């Protein structure tokens, strides 16, 4: 029997690092890059295998087959470029002022290692600012015996003035900015530590121990009455011997704070709020957010804007892409110029055009414009501003008006369809897919696109219960259930729809 052959193990410690460096060199040289990352107006080329291995965001996009990935424009392009370089090198240089931007970009790309590191950087930067200011060193009195400490606590609790429950709680007094932001501070919590600077020099060497205690204990003590009992441990009140609690209670009685908002906060809370900016500067008193009323109704006390003219007005005299200040245009916020010389508008009687009653036309949106009724005769003065491409005025007894697109010469009998079609030519795509970040000019296009991600068959046939992903497919299917048929007069072939018959008749040779 032959002896067992020797097995040699080859292990290169820096092989993975050198491989990434080689890939990074290929990326910088533009070799073998198979994916493009776009951020705002900038773009960069990279290898899809590296991006998918380092970022779940890129992996999800690449699994959908995208060769061009758009990063949401919430962070600067340079920050995303740094994170892509981090995937190749494993090193990242973060300045103190840029930590929040890098954290935001890493959260979008879902790079967990960078998220953890930036979170620690921000936490270390805010740790000195959130703690209470260091008091001046004072002589520390000798610790009291447990019996003396209990006697002192009973004396302080009995001498606490009525109407100020919880004023002797030193742990709550250290958290005015964290606990009192939504509402004005109470006398006990706001004036406790900063009532008298000369009395706040008591030693407070616990550091962050009180800050690290859970808020559940504080909430529980608030519900029970706010004061400590006899069974609590002595270390909870290390400042009793220095008279800190009595001074805090007296200062709370002498100077009750006025509910002046952010001006009552002091120490670290004031520094934190001053650095973040006053809330009054950001949101004035008259500000009411649009999401307070889900139904879109204006809340009481909110100033309302003057309603704009509800009629469909298309202006073609302005240059393309120019938006004028003031209230938004009723139909769509863009202006298209005709490719050729503008057609002269038909003559119209002088004077302002009569506006329809407000109850007939609601406030219009780009996708919800009212359609022209076939039996309705518009006012003669509204004809010059109805369409920029020389739409003919309608006279009684004539054919329904047609709206012709000045770009592709496509005609429409409905003003609603014409408006939606003109919005496509504007180049604006305000509707964006939340999965692949593709943008669409109309909401209908976005809804049709979302079926590719969800696969939901929301349209069902009422006759045979067959389901379809698109409404157009359902409409085509419903033709098979119609009892009437359109026969061909030449060959006798039967069709379910007249459009199919007309197409078939066009194929017949002329007699």
Swiss-Prot record:
Zinc fingers, C2H2-type class: 403-425, 431-453, 459-481, 486-508
Keywords, comma-separated and alphabetical: DNA-binding, Metal-binding, Neurogenesis, Nucleus, Repeat, Transcription, Transcription regulation, Zinc, Zinc-finger
Cellular localization per UniProt: Nucleus
GO cellular component: nucleoplasm
Compositionally biased residues, Acidic residues: 206-224
UniProt xrefs under Gene3D superfamilies: Classic Zinc Finger (3.30.160.60), Potassium Channel Kv1.1, Chain A (3.30.710.10)
Function (record text): May be involved in transcriptional regulation. In the central nervous system, may play a role in glial cell differentiation.
Protein name: Zinc finger and BTB domain-containing protein 45
